[in-house]
């Protein structure tokens, strides 16, 4: 059998896979439910409680012809998906909007109160925190927790959407992209996790650079194959270099800016209350107990830091953080709670150890991010955001499962060296003292990080592009 062009080949291959799935589907019931009562969370640091309850301005009885399913597979991706959903519900006529978070239970979406919105799928917190690909241990923990079974059930849900005239928006990397491709629906793909900055221009190098250079993109051949589907109506990348490299492969990828920068405040309305202090933001991550290990590492390092002024340490906590446990760790490291001291920047409590003050606040990341001079950060999304605000940061990798040495080095390369990765306590202290005392060095790092992360305003452009190319 001969095919006139590559699109016919793709359609034949998709039809072949679809027939296999149909056979599998006959052997299993169709699963679909809206999850309303799951309450635990592992959201990106500081985002969830800052989001107001969102009411729909969309008329469910309008003549909208499409329903939309958004599939996302990461905590940062959940935040991007939330912004897309908010804009859809307020501006665009759609029958129904559904979201399927593939990592965690998607509690961040509970702030949306609309009759034509729902969370669907089999949602649960994974033992690895969603990083089963980082280690064999993480994969095995997720496997025995039922990850593969739940993924297959979610897969069957997605396969049932084509007959209901759904459009799909995949946010993430391979898994949501594959789900969108196998659905038989037309789809858009927002590929945020991968960037060609990680292999093309340093700092440093890794063995994987040769592999990516050979491919010409950090996106793998099987992912590029899925992107070439005639049902893929728009591709959006996190930065210009990644989009351009895909364009060289005759793939029409667009770059509108990084939507991660749309979710942090750029104003410092209360910073005057702490402007006379050296200011440090401590980002320990949102996955426990890893976050507690990160906190202990940072507190041990801060014991020996020598600076001229008193130090304000901003410690924003994620919505799922156990504040009592955090306070116990502060106490174990020599900090005492100061009930009569207030800095009036939204803190829940103040802790002191000699010339260092720690301000503790739940869901205050958005409010505090732009108040710091330097960050100590063992996290993913939040580190990228403070870098985009022009704040250099330092990391010291731990045991994981998320923030391992390889993760930290990749992140540093992604952000052009704006995150300094340290191997030990002494190196971290030396780098921190330099950053707190040398303004010229900070300015150099600021320019690199801000350029890599891009400007605000990408979310609106992304939604407009998807609406034009997928929904009309």
Residue positions per predicted region:
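Nucleotide-activated sugar donor-binding and catalytic core shared by glycosyltransferases
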Residues: 2-25, 29, 34-38, 50-472
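Histidine-centered active-site/metal-ligand motif
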Residues: 47
């Amino acid at each position: 059998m001969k095919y006139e062009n590559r699109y016919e080949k793709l359609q034949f291959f998709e039809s072949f896979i679809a027939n296999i799935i149909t056979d599998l589907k006959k052997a299993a019931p169709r699963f679909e439910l809206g999850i309303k009562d799951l309450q635990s969370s592992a959201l990106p640091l500081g985002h969830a409680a800052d989001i107001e309850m969102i009411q729909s301005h969309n008329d469910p009885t309008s003549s909208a012809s499409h329903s939309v399913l958004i599939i996302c597979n990461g905590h940062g991706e959940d935040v991007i998906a939330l912004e897309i959903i908010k804009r859809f519900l307020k501006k665009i006529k759609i029958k129904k909007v559904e979201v399927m978070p593939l990592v965690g239970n998607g509690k961040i979406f509970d702030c949306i109160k609309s009759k034509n919105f729902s969370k669907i799928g089999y949602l649960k917190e994974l033992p690895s925190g969603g990083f089963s690909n980082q280690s064999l241990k993480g994969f095995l923990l997720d496997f025995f927790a039922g990850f593969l079974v739940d993924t297959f059930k979610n897969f069957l849900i997605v396969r049932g959407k084509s007959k209901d005239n759904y459009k799909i928006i995949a946010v993430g990397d391979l898994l949501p992209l594959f789900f969108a491709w196998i659905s038989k629906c037309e789809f858009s793909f927002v590929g945020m996790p991968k960037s060609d900055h990680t292999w093309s221009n340093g700092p440093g190098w890794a063995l994987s650079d040769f592999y990516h250079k050979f491919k010409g993109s950090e996106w793998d051949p099987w992912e590029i194959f899925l992107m070439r589907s005639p049902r893929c109506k728009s591709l959006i990348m996190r930065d210009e270099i990644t989009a351009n490299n895909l364009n060289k492969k005759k793939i029409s990828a667009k770059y509108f800016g990084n939507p991660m920068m749309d979710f942090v405040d750029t104003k410092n309305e209360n910073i005057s209350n702490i402007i006379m202090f050296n200011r440090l933001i401590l980002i320990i991550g949102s996955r426990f107990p890893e976050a507690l290990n990160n906190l202990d590492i940072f507190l041990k390092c801060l014991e020996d830091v020598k600076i001229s002024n008193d130090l304000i340490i901003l410690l924003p906590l994620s919505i799922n953080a156990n504040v009592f446990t955090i306070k116990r760790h502060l106490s174990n490291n020599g900090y005492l709670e100061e009930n009569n001291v207030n800095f009036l920047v939204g803190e829940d409590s103040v802790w002191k150890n000699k010339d260092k003050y720690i301000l503790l606040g739940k869901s205050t990341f958005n409010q505090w991010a732009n108040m710091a001079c330097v960050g100590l950060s063992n996290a993913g999304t939040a580190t990228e955001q403070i870098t985009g605000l022009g704040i250099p940061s330092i990391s010291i990798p731990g045991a994981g499962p998320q923030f391992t040495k390889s993760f930290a080095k990749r992140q540093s390369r992604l952000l052009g060296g704006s995150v300094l990765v340290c191997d030990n306590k002494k190196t971290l202290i030396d780098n921190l003292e330099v950053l707190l005392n040398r303004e010229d060095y900070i300015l150099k790092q600021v320019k690199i990080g801000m350029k890599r992360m891009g400007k605000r305003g990408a979310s609106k452009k992304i939604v407009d592009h998807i609406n034009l190319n997928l929904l009309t």
